[in-house]
């Protein structure tokens, strides 16, 4: 089995670590910064696993297709996906190589899904959004829906620490997620709602506790209704500590996430680009001091509501802990495709081609467990 891993950043390293632990025979890690890729290859190489490093320019189709040649599957962690999602998938289609990525932006998700027929004609399997959120959360939604006779509502909730190991791409994604209008699904129709609106306080088990979440720009409301018959799908996100999330939402409400340039002393400046640079500088300078040494924990929840045997029933799935990272799910998805466990051809979100129970078994092997709670309404 040969897997080409694109991106030597935080998510790429996590995916590489899992691939090595799984003893994938041959791994090529490719990045624009070849030195960074070489460092990872050296750090993780073992007797059982052959790892090599290559240069790749994600803005150059020829560079992408060249590095993809001979792979069983390409796993892409190159972000932001608003810029590189479609570019990399088109290269995989041209190279006729199976593909998995962790695209977590709404519009690129639609653009990638629109390549379904091209991927099918190229006889490849492409799974997009195969991370934590989206990704594992989508499969939790599918798993809960399979247990109900009728699905009425699916709520997806994610909460991330203010400081991320993935750096600039994560900052840019968070700004996009809480800026402008974002997709939701209500009463069987796709609608746009204001990002950062409809605050909800969710209580998680300790050490997380109560967290504020808001409508956020994620692909789940766009993909889940295509495969699950449901009336409402929403995705809300939050940032911990709570005060940091509040300030972040307020910050963006002033237009600092906008993409239209404004003049600053006669020089055009894009507010969103300025904000990314400002936040990265702030985190670099004050870092852990900003959160007062507080231990921050990542958490996700999926709630699936409907009816079972005529009774109102809901299933709640929680994932708690900083081990839940997109890179691990990306590696699992890539191995499932490479091993032939997934045979559908075309472009799919995870819920479109993966059986949840099979994926959850892979998570268990890695010590990652999802808690499930069922609530049923009973008449007294």
Predicted regions and their residues:
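Conserved Rossmann-fold cofactor-binding substructure of NAD(P)-dependent oxidoreductases
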Residues: 56-71, 77-80
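Conserved N-terminal Rossmann-fold NAD(P)-binding element of oxidoreductases
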Residues: 3-7
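ADP-ribose/adenylate-binding Rossmann-like module
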Residues: 80, 89-109
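C-terminal catalytic/substrate-binding lobe primarily of soluble NAD(P)-dependent oxidoreductases
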Residues: 147-380
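Helix N-cap at the beta1-alpha1 junction of Rossmann-like dinucleotide-binding domains, i.e.
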Residues: 33-36
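Rossmann-fold cofactor-recognition segment
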Residues: 46-60
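N-terminal Rossmann-fold NAD(P) dinucleotide-binding loop
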Residues: 12-13
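Rossmann-fold NAD(P)-binding glycine/threonine-rich loop
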Residues: 102-125
């Amino acid at each position: 089995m040969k897997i080409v891993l694109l991106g030597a950043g935080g998510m790429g390293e996590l995916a590489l670590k899992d691939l090595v632990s799984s003893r994938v025979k041959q791994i090529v890690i490719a990045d624009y910064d070849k030195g960074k890729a070489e460092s990872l290859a050296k750090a993780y190489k073992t007797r059982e696993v052959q790892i090599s490093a290559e240069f790749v320019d994600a803005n150059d189709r020829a560079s992408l297709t060249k590095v993809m040649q001979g792979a069983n599957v390409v796993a892409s962690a190159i972000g932001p996906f608003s810029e590189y999602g479609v570019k990399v998938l088109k290269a995989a289609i041209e190279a006729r190589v199976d593909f998995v990525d962790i695209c977590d932006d709404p519009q690129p998700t639609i653009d990638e899904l629109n390549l379904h027929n091209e991927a099918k004609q190229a006889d490849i399997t492409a799974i997009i959004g195969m991370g934590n959120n989206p990704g594992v959360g989508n499969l939790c939604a599918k798993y809960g829906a399979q247990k109900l006779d009728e699905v009425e509502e699916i709520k997806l909730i994610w909460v991330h620490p203010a400081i991320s190991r993935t750096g600039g791409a994560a900052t840019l994604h968070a700004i996009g997620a809480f800026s402008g209008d974002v997709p939701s699904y209500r009463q069987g129709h796709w609608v746009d709602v204001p990002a950062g609106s409809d605050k909800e306080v969710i209580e998680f088990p300790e050490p997380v506790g109560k967290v504020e979440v808001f409508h956020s720009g994620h692909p789940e409301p766009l993909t889940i209704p295509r495969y699950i018959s449901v009336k409402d799908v929403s995705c809300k996100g939050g940032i911990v500590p709570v005060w940091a999330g509040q300030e972040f939402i307020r910050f963006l409400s002033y237009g600092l996430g906008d993409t239209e340039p404004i003049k600053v002393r006669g020089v055009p400046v894009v507010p969103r680009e300025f904000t990314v640079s400002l936040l990265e500088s702030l985190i670099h300078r004050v870092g852990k001091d900003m959160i007062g040494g507080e231990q921050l924990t990542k958490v996700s929840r999926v709630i699936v509501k409907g009816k079972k045997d005529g009774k109102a029933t809901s299933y709640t799935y929680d994932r708690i802990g900083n081990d839940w990272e997109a890179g691990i799910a990306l590696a699992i998805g890539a191995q499932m495709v490479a091993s032939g466990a997934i045979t559908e051809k075309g472009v799919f979100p995870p819920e479109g081609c993966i059986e949840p129970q099979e994926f959850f078994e892979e998570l268990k092997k890695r010590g990652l467990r999802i808690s499930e709670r069922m609530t049923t309404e009973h008449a007294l």
